[in-house]
Amino acid sequence: MTLFSSISSISNPMTSSKSSIASFGSGTSMSSNSNACGGGCGGGNGGILGLGLGLGLNLFGGSRSRGACGGNNGGSGNPGNGPFSGGSCCGSPCCGI
């Protein structure tokens, strides 16, 4: 289980207005073959919880939570539909898989 937090000034894609928020930024993996990523990496569309806080939380076995990079739809490996989906996460390819 990995956990990291970050505070960043991000642009919220829901309102298209910049705001400095404390992103929850929890990249948490709860299944053995999942890849948790996200948290303060641009806001995304709220991840699977729809909070708009860059939450990358994986509760589904085998799925990959894209977190701030677009959000997982809850299925196994479903791509996010946010502005950051398919891109990189803080410069690393964890969300581009």
UniProtKB/Swiss-Prot annotation:
Query: Which top-level group of life is the source organism from?
Result: Eukaryota
According to its UniProt entry, this protein's organism is Dictyostelium discoideum
For the region Disordered, what residue ranges are annotated?
1-33
Spell out the protein name for this chain: HssA/B-like protein 47
A Pfam family that the UniProt record links to this protein = Coiled
Among InterPro entries, the record links this protein to: HssA/B-like_chaperone, HssA/B-related
Question: What does the sequence similarity comment in the record state about its family?
Answer: Belongs to the hssA/B family.
An example GO biological process term is:
sorocarp development
